[in-house]
C-alpha cells in the first residue's frame, strides 16, 4: 500500500527502444537505449558545431556575438561539376608516328631480363628500365647501361647550387 501512496510505480514491463534496435530503453533516456541516446546527443552536438562554424564563416569570423540556437540547421550545398579530360596515348604521340603504345605495359608474366626466370611480384625494376630477379638485380650482375655516377653528380649539383658572393671594393 505504501507504493500507491508515494506515487512510485514500477513499470508494467520492459520498454523496447523507440529506434527498434532490439535493446531496452528507459524513461530517463526518452525510451531509448543507451547507445541510441548517446548517438542522438552526438548528432545534436555536431549540428551545433556545424551551425556555429557556418555562422562564423558567413559573418566573417564574428563568432560569439550571437547566441546559437539548438535545432535543425539548414545548409545549402552547391553542386559542382568536375570535368576531366583524358588524353589517349595515341593522341599525345600524334598519328604521324608509327609507334604503337601498349596501355597494359608488358605482355605475359614478369620475367628477369637476363635469365628469363619468372619473378612475379618479387621482381626488381632497375633504372635502366628492365626487370630482374633477386640474383641479377644489382647493376654489376646484369651489365647495366645506366650511368649512376653521372646521375648522382647531376642530382648533387642540382640540390646544392653554387653560391658566389660579389667582390668587395677596396676603400
Swiss-Prot record:
Source species, domain of life: Eukaryota
Upregulating conditions: By cold, dehydration and salt stress.
Cited PROSITE patterns: ZF_A20, ZF_AN1
Zinc finger (AN1-type): 106-152
Residues the entry annotates as binding Zn(2+) 3: 126, 128, 142, 144
SUPFAM superfamilies, sorted: AN1-like Zinc finger, Glucocorticoid receptor-like (DNA-binding domain)
ZnF region ranges: A20-type: 11-45
Keyword ATP-binding attached: no
Keyword Metal-binding belongs to the record: yes
Keyword terms: Metal-binding, Stress response, Zinc, Zinc-finger
Binding positions (Zn(2+) 1): 17, 21, 33, 36
Residues annotated for Zn(2+) 2 binding in this entry: 112, 115, 133, 136
UniProt xrefs under InterPro entries: AN1-like_Znf, AN1_A20_ZnFinger, Znf_A20, Znf_AN1
Molecular function (Gene Ontology), one example: DNA binding
Function (record text): May be involved in environmental stress response.
Protein name as annotated: Zinc finger A20 and AN1 domain-containing stress-associated protein 8
Species per Swiss-Prot/TrEMBL record: Oryza sativa subsp. indica
Classification of source organism: Eukaryota, Viridiplantae, Streptophyta, Embryophyta, Tracheophyta
